[in-house]
């Protein structure tokens, strides 16, 4: 970055969960941070007040493991949740949808976009969030109802302390 004159652009490699090297940033970019590593990166971006967040999530296993047969909404979604492949894909989409909603709750205008054709990679979802400092109305109740219905507790909600009904 320095060789191109970007002296304020920094790249860091390591475990984001415990990283404490900065107090604020302009932009956070994540690419294929596996499972809850994406959640830790998004939580740090919110904590640092990043003006822009660009995140391409990778594998999303957390909610797949949390959706159990005892969940309140399991019977209604049995046509999807009874089949491993469908449950895995549903959990991945649900994870990214909830991440988008948590970012909206945190004052970001958020979009979920396809950033590359499916023929190149099935992991082609981009979460694009721009800070507005205005929480989107209704997103908290939507997330709460979804969590209650499926009996899930997403990591990003825990990290952002959005784990209870408001």
Question: Where are each of the predicted segments found?
Answer:
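Class I S-adenosyl-L-methionine
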Residues: 1-166
